[in-house]
A protein has these predicted regions:
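Active-site acidic/histidine proton-transfer and metal-coordination neighborhood
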Residues: 10-24, 38-40, 60-67, 97-109, ...
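Residue-level detector of anion-binding/catalytic polar loops
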Residues: 72-73, 106, 143, 184, ...
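Charged helix-capping and loop-helix junction motifs
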Residues: 89-94, 126-131, 160-171, 230-238, ...
Length: 307
């Protein structure tokens, strides 16, 4: 075979990645060898979380931009311009469902409900609000909703375990309600003292509900092992991943130029048979959004040897 400049560069890049980067994706039956470059024919699926990028888009713009950039899923954040809220009428909900279905675009919803308050009236308000939001999700064809834990006292505080148990019990009630509607409840790795995998694991244990899932949010502690609870200190990415791998239903992505070990995470997800979406959740709205989405997708695929 004649060696072209492209083949040479591809082969060199893959060889270097295999040596230097942990979690390098090795050849499989789904991968096709092309001139020494192993092409991943089954990459993970990319989506958009309308945190800042997309916050000012209406539904038509979301569909147009996601189709143009080949994103397969959108997580619609509450209060943003697309207006997918519990105030929608039955006819409006049916219209939202039809528009996304016709576009071939999967959707989830992102709420801000949380379950740590010691005020029982406030806690019940959040639980009931979650159930109302789950009904909205079912009506518009969403596959799941995002919720928060959203805070626990520091270790050593005698109320810590009580709050963790309260969060777990509340989430369990919501998860059962959601399952009856065909909608997943996904608690995000987020909040004060709850933005790490071991604490999310503890919450899942307290919930003891097979219908409760989680969102992997890419906290630095995932790979540094810093700031984790007693008994988990220094735990690495793979060990933390294994704690929750059967409960991950969504992943939030940050900028790919960060220090987070993306290639290793993508490899772990692939090996675990992850079928969900990875949604970009970037903090800069000032960029040229469509161009950024296209470039992000290139980096996302390149880190999986999928282009």
């Amino acid at each position: 075979m004649t060696t072209t400049r492209r083949n040479f560069l591809q082969t060199a890049a893959v060889s270097a990645a295999a040596v230097v980067l942990p979690g390098f994706i090795t050849p499989s039956e789904q991968q096709k060898e092309q001139g020494g470059f192993v092409l991943n024919k089954n990459p993970l699926k990319l989506g958009l979380m309308t945190y800042l990028v997309g916050r000012s888009w209406d539904i038509d713009t979301i569909i147009k931009n996601c189709k143009e950039t080949k994103y397969e899923h959108v997580q619609l954040r509450t209060t943003h311009a697309h207006g997918v809220e519990v105030t929608l009428t039955a006819a409006q909900r049916a219209d939202v469902k039809k528009r996304f279905k016709d576009a071939g675009l999967a959707i989830s919803l992102a709420s801000a409900f949380q379950y740590h308050s010691t005020d029982q009236a406030e806690l019940r308000k959040n639980i009931d609000g979650t159930k109302e939001f789950l009904q909205l999700a079912a009506d518009v064809g969403a596959i799941g909703i995002r919720v928060f834990p959203n805070a626990v006292p520091k270790e050593g505080d005698k109320t810590r375990e009580k709050i963790l148990a309260q969060i777990g019990k509340s989430l369990s009630e919501c998860a059962t309600f959601g399952n009856n509607l065909g909608v997943e409840v996904r608690v995000e790795e987020h909040g004060q003292g709850t933005a790490n995998i071991p604490v999310i694991t503890q919450i899942l244990d307290f919930a003891d509900n097979p219908y409760l899932y989680m969102i992997w949010n890419n906290s630095n502690s995932d790979y540094t092992g810093e700031g984790l609870p007693k008994g988990y200190e220094g735990m690495g990415l793979e060990a933390q991943f294994n704690l929750v791998k059967d409960r991950i239903r969504n992943v939030h992505l940050r900028e790919l130029f960060s220090d987070y070990p993306w290639r290793q995470l993508f490899s772990l997800l692939s090996k675990a048979g992850y079928k969900g979406y990875l949604d970009i959740e970037l903090s800069d709205e000032s960029c040229e959004a469509v161009r950024m989405m296209k470039n992000y997708r290139v980096g996302f695929l390149a880190l999986q040897n999928a282009m």
